[in-house]
């Protein structure tokens, strides 16, 4: 049973205005200093792991109380996650670290339905959270013998005075008609309930980025882990689980040529993935992170509609901002291109759009209605097979067998009897109009309404509720 802790952050808050401080996220002129004090409701011996599965943080922002509900991101790593560095003679040095007791969380702010939070508790609290439409960050202060943290708005981070940074994808580059037309489709709410998909990510860090962080592989690894945690959070809106499968740091030299031409570098990386990477590692989509400054202020590039293709399921992203969340948005943006999305136009609706061509002064964290339609069209028309398997459990790769009560690769439902009104026994696919075939939140081939109780609690525990977008009964993150 998940042990839920109530952790109260008792804050001594000191606003600093006019003075300046340098944090990992950049230079700040306005921030609040807070001193967290952890108070646990359970005896220390009752907590089996170093990091709890579910937590709550209570503290104040701008003098107002805030309660943050957090749940550990169980989908952050695939079951075969590995890290590889390279020796001076280019030999691979592999490691398979234990990542079950990791320190990365997702969450929300109580009484704010539109809030989001992504947090690392590895070395103090490092997080971003959105409340009332504004993005805040919290980071530890490097003050001797204290637990001081800084809380600040994203807008208070000093911005570089430079030309706008942008994606290198053009609307007519490697695109196809079905996704161009997708933003014009009228998609009903029922059609927008996306089937769950799983993307295993392989992240490669080039030698320039390794040098940028003074050869500190541990720092780079933590930075990448936090970025994937952010990507995972943003992709939840599309019911996509993104899990890190491979992290490679080119600590000695680049294994391909990375230059100022983003198209050239991307082409070389794609060819290398096809001929080398796929023979070594299991993954669905690979991204190369680099410190190289590309021509034309480009910070990323990816083929449109390339997901699962051996050469085109790739992206390149420049590590262009000290705030790792901003870089994670760029990584999500480029992966969005691989999933059939184009850049947002004026007619697209979202608060701050992930798929905007130019990096906004305001942090982007939402897919637009156009993106949702384009993604829906892409997975329907092209059915990328590699993202069907759940990387958190061993994949089943045998030939589909009717009625074995196990969804295998390529199946949408367990075939079973030809009389099943939801599942076509000949194809193991859902019948037209069906959203599901079985599950506690499936009723007459349709997802049950969000908020419907699907598992009644026992004792002092809490009920589980349907989420309206899947047939399974998700576990309530606030179980006792």
Curated annotation (Swiss-Prot):
It holds the Pfam family Pep_M12B_propep. GO terms for cellular component: extracellular region; plasma membrane. CDD domains: ZnMc_adamalysin_II_like. It is found in: Secreted. The active site is at 334. Binds 1 zinc ion per subunit. Residues 399-480 form the Disintegrin domain. GO terms for molecular function: metal ion binding; metalloendopeptidase activity; toxin activity. Keywords: Cell adhesion impairing toxin, Disulfide bond, Glycoprotein, Hemostasis impairing toxin, Hydrolase, Metal-binding, Metalloprotease, Platelet aggregation inhibiting toxin, Protease, Secreted, Signal, Toxin, Zinc, Zymogen. Disulfide bonds join 308-386, 348-370, 350-353, 413-428, 415-423, 422-445, 436-442, 441-466, 454-473. It comes from the Eukaryota. Gene3D superfamilies: Collagenase (Catalytic Domain) (3.40.390.10), Disintegrin domain (4.10.70.10). The keyword Metal-binding applies. Residues 21-190 form a propeptide. GO terms for biological process: proteolysis. Expressed by the venom gland. It is an enzyme of class 3 (hydrolase). Its cofactor is Zn(2+). Glycans are attached at residues 259, 279. Its EC number is 3.4.24.-. Residues 197-391 form the Peptidase M12B domain. Zn(2+) binds at residues 333, 337, 343. Belongs to the venom metalloproteinase (M12B) family. P-II subfamily. P-IIa sub-subfamily. The disintegrin belongs to the medium disintegrin subfamily. Monomer. This is Zinc metalloproteinase/disintegrin.
